[in-house]
């Protein structure tokens, strides 16, 4: 099994919208990809809790069967379609994949 974790920090304003609006849109777009390929065992999208000490605004945690499933997810048209929006609204992205 492989764990895929991505964290994003958003611009205060981008694409004509405030940060909070873009965070909610990003969360919905990411969640729409939860079942696009077989082999995704867990798919969690969370947003920073107000008042907590957070360095990023949104986190994605995925558990997949193997690297082939992750590659299929990353290349799936539905996932590829959200990348332009994410690139426009995100200030910083951090990613880590590891075997569990």
How would you label these PLM feature ranges?
Residues 1-57, 65-71, 99-100:
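Short S/T/G/P-rich N-terminal loop/turn motif that feeds into the first structured element of a domain
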Residues 64-89:
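C-terminal structural segments of small proteins and small subunits
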Residues 91-96:
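Interfacial aromatic-anchored transmembrane helix boundaries in multi-pass membrane proteins
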